Amino acid sequence: MKNSGSCLIIGGGMAGLMAATVLKRHGLDVTVLDKGRGIGGRLATRRLTYSEEIEGVFDYGAQYFTVSDAVGTLRDREFQGWVDEWLAEGVITEWSQGFFQESGSFKSSNKPCYRGTKSNRSLAQYLAQSLTVHTNAQVTRLSWQDDHWQVQSQTGEFFQGDRLILTPPVPQSLTLLDHSDIAINPEIRQKLEQVTYYPCITMLALMEKPSQIPAPGGLWGSGHPLGWIACNYQKGISTKGYAVTLQAGPEFSQNYWDQDNAEIAQQLLKAADSWLSSKVLDYQIHRWRYSQVAVSYGEPCLVLTEPGPLILAGDGFLAPKIEGAVLSGLAAARSLLPLR
């Protein structure tokens, strides 16, 4: 059954893109606004060009995703249905069913670890290709006027919609609501304020020679300081350069958050020396303030009706990682479909 009406979605990560995809399939006019230069949120991919012959491609946010059996069997089947669709379309592929650990032992995931076929961001780009998406759209204010939401961006643009979904990290959504003078029930707000995230400092290192990371190209660290190392060349997305992603653990990321990039790079390269043993041609440092959920809201999404139809969603609500973001976005879409 087709629905009339429109919906604005703030945030172009997986929660926002999945909500937008479902709502559009049900006939709503959907607009996605994202503050970044590219779509995907933590499905993030970046290129480092060293020369005409050498270019590294890095997945530097989420490294892969799985379909777990811990979130709820009905919802898992729903997510698996989407995964099957993406596999059939060739958008994603299985990377592995586990990775080696820093200790040298292999840790099985007991389930497929999926990745984007071209890159992890390519999944987000696939979803976005049929949607109306505005990037570089930093939203600064929300208002409910004449039975619709009006959203203003930092550049002065205005967007309107009958419904509104917020999918940024919870602290950012709360800040936006505060700046917009939109009040939330004190008990609900207190629960939202308890949602917390681990930070993650990530290094993108373009190496002169192949890494020593064991196949299939991922390695779990102890978290002190490295939590994860990935060889994007082995992963199959960086064919013209030996691109290595190094992700620090939460404690290191917190302690070194304000340190300069050179000091961070020195520490992470020292920790990874056994698996690199090669000259670094170029590198970048990226800081993920809201990398992974530490304490979640405990519900798939938050549905509010005042001052107008407003949904808060994202991985901070149901469960961490890509799966949690997807399931939250699907729940957000379902909650709005009865509002015809």
Positions of PLM-derived features:
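Short beta-strand to alpha-helix junction loop
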Residues: 67-68, 74, 100-126, 258-264
